[in-house]
From Swiss-Prot:
This is Cobalt transport protein CbiN. It holds the Pfam family CbiN. HAMAP family: CbiN. It is a multi-pass membrane protein. It comes from Clostridium perfringens (strain 13 / Type A). The lineage of its organism: Bacteria, Bacillati, Bacillota, Clostridia, Eubacteriales. The gene is cbiN.
Amino acid sequence: MKNKRVLTNVILLLLVVFITIIPFFVAKNGEFGGSDDQAEEAITQIDENYEPWFSPLFEPASGEIESLLFALQAAIGAGVIGFGLGYLKGKKKVNDEVNDKHR
């Protein structure tokens, strides 16, 4: 039972690595731009005189700080999801133990 779980985890890990690496080989000379840049380009093609009606509340000082904030946001989100999944798994384990004692 445990060997099957380990094998499944290894296969899933290899699949994640494969899915992560394959785009670099498929699009060797591809330009990895952000969606904001693509949207701005599409809007200026439609209307060159377009002025945004909204401005950001906070503008980071540099691209590096913007990347840091984005990575921090992703890490916090992953932590919240991991905590939630761990909590649910622990809750299920406790419920299973309680149910086993009552049988």
